[in-house]
């Protein structure tokens, strides 16, 4: 009988030498961030791009970020407790619920792939929304409506459900990964099984295209923000009332050039983190599909697969912090006091010194 490729594919206990600490940290951090984000969303709608005309809430971005937050929170609540229960009972997912046989592992892998794909699609929708609102405002005002924003989450969910259910229909395969607390798409090829290879490559290719499109949209938005920053530096008093930002006391004030930097830096941070967390699992899928892994290297290869899956789960942790918490008025006031105000003070001092020296 041919032995399974993965060492833990048929094991019934958690592999020794592994701890639940990492899973607990990921779960608690993700739960805290998403609950805090939901609280902030419940209090007020947050607009991502400050140059967007003021409009009654909720905005399109508000609809999109609500869908992403709910998706991330559901993913954490459905998947992380299962991992922690496996560690606590020292049982692999295949036997954690004996009455379900191997169904728990299959369901875990399905939801893992579903939430990974669904979150990435929603992140692309948010990046596209931000890029259009900054770079193509007339098109945005005419075509991007609240109804369209409200349709994103259900359409994305329906597509992700259909795509991630293909292994249940014989196209692709879900397997248990070491240390026995994870199940996911099989990312190594089997002789005589093109469907396993095909689905793994198809899933990773789709994820790669979504990541590339998201990064390009974010780079386009960053380019527009930088152009605004340069224009405000050259013409600080030429901004119209539509460009005014609400101050902490509720009044509107003309934006200063340095106030564009927090948008630019936050968008750059989001792009870097999103890319770093998404690429490992994409790389591992291609590597496993086309690289002939030797028997003696399987342990290290499975450790790399586990690390890539953990990186993928980090996306749902950083999403609420970057999109909501860091965009909240309280954090913006803190950020401006600590970073923007000192930079502005130095800029004024430098200008005064230059004027005095010229006199």
Swiss-Prot record:
It is linked to Asthma-related traits 1: Asthma-related traits include clinical symptoms of asthma, such as coughing, wheezing, dyspnea, bronchial hyperresponsiveness as assessed by methacholine challenge test, serum IgE levels, atopy and atopic dermatitis. Belongs to the G-protein coupled receptor 1 family. GO terms for cellular component: membrane; plasma membrane. The chain crosses the membrane at residues 22-42, 60-80, 108-128, 151-171, 196-216, 263-283, 311-331. Disulfide bonds join 105-183. Coiled coil: none annotated. Receptor for prostaglandin D2 (PGD2). The activity of this receptor is mainly mediated by G(s) proteins that stimulate adenylate cyclase, resulting in an elevation of intracellular cAMP. A mobilization of calcium is also observed, but without formation of inositol 1,4,5-trisphosphate. Involved in PLA2G3-dependent maturation of mast cells. PLA2G3 is secreted by immature mast cells and acts on nearby fibroblasts upstream to PTDGS to synthesize PGD2, which in turn promotes mast cell maturation and degranulation via PTGDR. Residues 1-21, 81-107, 172-195, 284-310 are extracellular. Its main location: membrane. It is found in: Cell membrane. GO terms for biological process: adenosine metabolic process; cellular response to prostaglandin D stimulus; G protein-coupled receptor signaling pathway; inflammatory response; male sex determination; mast cell degranulation; positive regulation of cytosolic calcium ion concentration; sleep. It comes from Homo sapiens. Glycans are attached at residues 10, 90, 297. Keywords: Asthma, Cell membrane, Disulfide bond, G-protein coupled receptor, Glycoprotein, Mast cell degranulation, Membrane, Receptor, Transducer, Transmembrane, Transmembrane helix. GO terms for molecular function: prostaglandin D receptor activity; prostaglandin J receptor activity. It is a multi-pass membrane protein. Residues 43-59, 129-150, 217-262, 332-359 are cytoplasmic. This is Prostaglandin D2 receptor. Expressed in retinal choroid, ciliary epithelium, longitudinal and circular ciliary muscles, iris, small intestine and platelet membranes.
């Amino acid at each position: 009988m041919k032995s399974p490729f993965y060492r833990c594919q048929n094991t019934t206990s958690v592999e020794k030498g592994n701890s639940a600490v990492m899973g607990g940290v990921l779960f608690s951090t993700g739960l805290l961030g998403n609950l805090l984000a939901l609280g902030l969303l419940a209090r007020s709608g947050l607009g991502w791009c400050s140059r967007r005309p003021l409009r009654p809430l909720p905005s399109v971005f508000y609809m999109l970020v609500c869908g992403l937050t709910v998706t991330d929170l559901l993913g954490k609540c459905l998947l992380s407790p299962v991992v922690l229960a496996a560690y606590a009972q020292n049982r692999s997912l295949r036997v954690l619920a004996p009455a379900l046989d191997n169904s728990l592992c299959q369901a875990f892998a399905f939801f893992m792939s579903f939430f990974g794909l669904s979150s990435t699609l929603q992140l692309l929708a948010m990046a596209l929304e931000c890029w259009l609102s900054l770079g193509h405002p007339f098109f945005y005002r005419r075509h991007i409506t609240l109804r369209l924003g409200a349709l994103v989450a259900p359409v994305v969910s329906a597509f992700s459900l259909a795509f991630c259910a293909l292994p249940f229909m014989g196209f692709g395969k879900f397997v248990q990964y070491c240390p026995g607390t994870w199940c996911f798409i099989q990312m190594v090829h089997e002789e005589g099984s093109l469907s396993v290879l095909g689905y793994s490559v198809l899933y990773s290719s789709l994820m790669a295209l979504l990541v590339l499109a998201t990064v390009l949209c974010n780079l386009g938005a960053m380019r527009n923000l930088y152009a605004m920053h340069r224009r405000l530096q050259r013409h600080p008093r030429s901004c119209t009332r539509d460009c005014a930002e609400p101050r902490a006391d509720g009044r509107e004030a003309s934006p200063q050039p340095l106030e564009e930097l927090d948008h630019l830096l936050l968008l750059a941070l989001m792009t870097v983190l999103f890319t770093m967390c998404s690429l490992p699992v994409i790389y591992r899928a291609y590597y496993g599909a086309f690289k002939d892994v030797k028997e003696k290297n399987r342990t290290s290869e499975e450790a790399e697969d586990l690390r890539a899956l953990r990186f993928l789960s980090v996306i749902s942790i950083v999403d609420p912090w970057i999109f909501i918490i860091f965009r909240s008025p309280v954090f913006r006031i803190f950020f401006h006091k600590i970073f923007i105000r000192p930079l502005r003070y130095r800029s004024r001092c430098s200008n005064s010194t230059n004027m005095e020296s010229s006199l």
